[in-house]
Structure formats: C-alpha cells, structure tokens
Design a protein with these regions (language model features):
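Helix-breaking motifs and short loop linkers at transmembrane-helix boundaries and internal kinks
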Residues: 76, 97-102, 114, 248, ...
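Juxtamembrane intracellular "pre-TM" segments in multi-pass secondary transporters
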Residues: 2-7, 187-224, 245-246
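Cytoplasmic helix-loop-helix junction between adjacent transmembrane helices
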Residues: 107-146
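A membrane-interface helix-boundary motif in multi-pass transporters
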Residues: 160-173, 363-389
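Short amphipathic helix-loop junctions that connect adjacent transmembrane helices
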Residues: 30-47, 237-254
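Helix-to-loop junctions at the C-terminal end of transmembrane segments
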Residues: 63-76, 268-282, 365
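Conserved MFS/SLC helix-loop-helix module at the cytosolic interface between two early adjacent transmembrane helices
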Residues: 62-101
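C-terminal transmembrane helical hairpin of 12-TM major facilitator-type secondary transporters
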Residues: 283-326
Length: 406
C-alpha cells in the first residue's frame, strides 16, 4: 500500500474506533431513563433490565467474534468493518425508535453480532504495519478508546437534556457518516493471495480457553484477572443507575462523571504507568494497584454525597497500574511462539466476564433497592467488587509465592 494511502487508512481506522467508542459513550448516561420509560418502572427495576441488555450484547459478541474474524480472513477486512459500522447504526436506530424493551434487546443482539470493529480494525492495522511502526499504530487503538470515552459520555449527557432518545439518533448518525466515508475511502488491507479458507474450528469461541489449561503455572494469575474483570462491572454496568438512584444525578451529571473517569484512566494508562512500573516493579505494581481498586470500591459503596464519587474516583482509577503489570507477568510466563494464542485467550476471557458481570452487578443493585428489599444498600455491587478484589490480592500473592519456589 502506498504511503499516502496507508496514512489515510490508519487515520480512518482511528476515526472508526473513535466514533465507535464515542457512540457507545453517548448512550450510557441516558440508557437508565429510556429503560424506565419503556418498562414504566423505577430506576431499581430498570437496572435489572440494563444488566440483561449488557448480557445480550456480550453473549452474542462472544459467540460471533471468532466467526467474524474468520470471515475477515476469507473475504478481507474492508467489508467486515463496513458491515460492523452499518450494524451499529441499525442498533442505535432500533434503540432510538424502540416502542418496547424488546426492541432494545434486538438492537443489542444486532450490535453484538456485527460488533467486531475493534478485532477487525486490529487485524487491519497488523496488515498494513511494518515492524518499525507496529507499536505506534496499535497505540492509536488505546488513544481512540480513551478519547472516545471522554467525549462520548459528556456529549451524551448534554444531548440527553433534550430527550432520552436524542443521543441514540446522534450515535446512529455518526455511524452512518463513518460507513459512507469508509465505503468511498477505505482500501482493502488483506491481499487476495494472503487470504485463507473459512474454518469452523477456528470460529469456535470456547477453543481458546483450552490454551489456558495447557499452562497451569499461570492459573492463579488468570483467576485473579477473571475476578478483576468481573469486579470492574460494578462500575461499568452500575454507575449510571447507582448515581441516579442515590444522588438524583441528571444525565448531564452522569455524563460529566464518566468523562472524568475516561480522563483519569487515560492519565494513569498513558502517563503514570510509565513512571510507576520501572520504579515499583511489576509485582508491587499489581499489589498497589489492587489495593487502590479495593479502596476505591469500598468508598463508593458507602458514599453519602455525590461529590464523594468524584473524589473516590482517584484511588479507583489509580488501580489501573495493576492491569498492564499483571498482563506483562502472564505474557512472560508463556513462550514467544504462543503469544498470539495467549492474547486471543485473554480476549475471550474478557468477553466471558462481560457476560457474567453486568447481570450479576445490576441484579444485586435491584435486590437491595426494590420495594421489598430485606434492607436498603444501593452500594452492594461495589461492596461485592471490593470483596472480589481482596480475594484477587490473596490469589496473586499465593501465585507469586509458588512461582518463587519453582
């Protein structure tokens, strides 16, 4: 690919991911109110449906991502990326027009089936990158996520002021514009002579878990990673419902708070980690990070004023020094010729926890906030997440202890 076309293609992939994440971020602040409107119930009941909507998206994406990845190997990246963008636009239109809650489920399932833009975009970047610029180009994925999660929720909160459905129309419009831009501009990255036949064995979403079973030496660290991912859904799936219920936050305030989350995560992942990991080392980074996560979650659980949530975001987001260090230790425990398989397995693992986490955390919120609850404790999901983080500290300590003995 010519250099000018290559730069344009990389720019398009960055914009694609940015719009994807921005579109997703736009709808987060208004989902609770839209669900309330459709089921004619309070925020507690809406949270339960919100968790199952998260499940519907994550489950279909888990099943279809390997299938879509295989299709991109056979037919090329361009058609898959374009179908993905169109699928997201259809999803957002379904959500905007939804006359009943079941339309939301149908929209989320459509998005889960077609929503392989990140996977296919990563493959696209791998196709057109050289060894010298590969890391820099892949860094654009992280940058798009960070920027999109700052812009999206804030924009969604502002648009939500004009109606719960307005942000969905905005997200659909962004995806359709991106689809049209890609249709006319985006070149194919995978040459026909490099394509391979579709194989149902490679399209098996469970197959990658077998790889982890071949490496019992990392089983403890993998278990800790699972608990961390599940605990994260106390914030990811529950934040909007909790803050609206507990502090009467508007969509605008929810959007601003999530924009702050995106900014803090970006600062920790982009800047702080470069300073902490060389000085603390990977093992201490994991311990300190897990401790910060746990402290932040415990404080969220018992927050009594809205401003406290902003203050408590600081220790929680500082916990972000843990993840990269933990993944680094895991990758060092696996031979270099198995790294691709390992990353595929870790991605499948994250998808699987996204199936479990949302309904677990939102149903727990419902259990402790509905009219017949044994007692009111809206912070229960954060408290459960705190316990999971504490257990992960014990597991990682035990795993490192065993490693030292080997």
């Amino acid at each position: 690919m010519e250099n000018s076309k290559k730069k344009a293609a990389i720019g398009f992939i960055f914009i694609t991911l940015l719009i994807d994440i921005t579109g997703w971020g736009i709808i987060i602040p208004v989902v609770p109110k839209l669900i309330e409107e459709l089921i004619h119930a309070d925020i507690s009941e809406a949270a339960k449906y919100g968790g199952w909507l998260g499940f519907a998206y994550a489950f279909t994406q888990f099943i279809f991502s390997p299938l879509v990845g295989n299709l991109s190997d056979k037919y090329g990246r361009r058609p898959i990326i374009l179908i993905s963008l169109f699928g997201f636009a259809v999803d957002y239109i379904f959500l905007a027009l939804a006359p009943s809650i079941w339309w939301l489920f149908l929209g989320r399932i459509i998005a889960g089936i077609t929503g392989a833009s990140v996977t296919t975009a990563s493959a696209y970047i791998a196709d057109i990158s050289t060894d010298e610029d590969r890391a820099k180009n892949f860094g654009l994925i992280g940058a798009a996520f960070g920027l999109g999660f700052i812009i999206g929720p804030v924009l969604g909160g502002v648009l939500g002021h004009y109606g719960a459905r307005v942000p969905f129309y905005a997200a659909a419009g962004l995806c359709l514009l991106n689809f049209l831009y890609g249709y006319f501009i985006l070149p194919e990255s995978l040459d026909k002579d490099k394509r391979r036949e579709f194989d149902w064995k490679r399209a098996n979403p469970v197959g990658s878990f077998k790889f982890l079973g071949k490496h019992p030496e990392i089983s403890g660290l993998i278990t800790a990673l699972i608990l961390i991912y599940i605990a994260g859904h106390a914030v990811q799936s529950n934040w909007s419902f909790f803050t609206m219920y507990k502090f009467n936050w508007t969509e605008r305030m929810v959007g601003i708070s999530l924009g702050v989350v995106g900014l803090l995560v970006g600062l920790v992942q982009g800047l702080l980690i470069r300073w902490t990991t060389p000085r603390l080392g990977e093992q201490k980074s994991i311990y300190y990070g897990l401790a910060m996560y746990a402290i932040g979650l415990l404080l969220f659980a018992f927050a009594s004023e809205g401003w406290m949530m902003f203050a408590f975001l600081v220790p929680y987001c500082l916990g972000g020094i843990c993840g990269p260090a933990l993944q680094s230790v895991i990758t060092k425990s696996v031979p270099s010729n198995e790294q691709g398989e390992l990353q595929g397995a870790l991605t499948s693992l994250m998808s699987a926890t996204s199936i479990i986490g949302p309904p677990m955390m939102t149903n727990l919120f419902y259990f402790f906030t509905h009219d017949e609850a044994p007692f009111e404790f809206s912070g229960a999901p954060f408290f459960l997440a705190f316990i999971l983080m504490a257990i992960s500290v014990v597991i990682t300590y035990s795993a490192f202890k065993k490693k030292r003995k080997i």
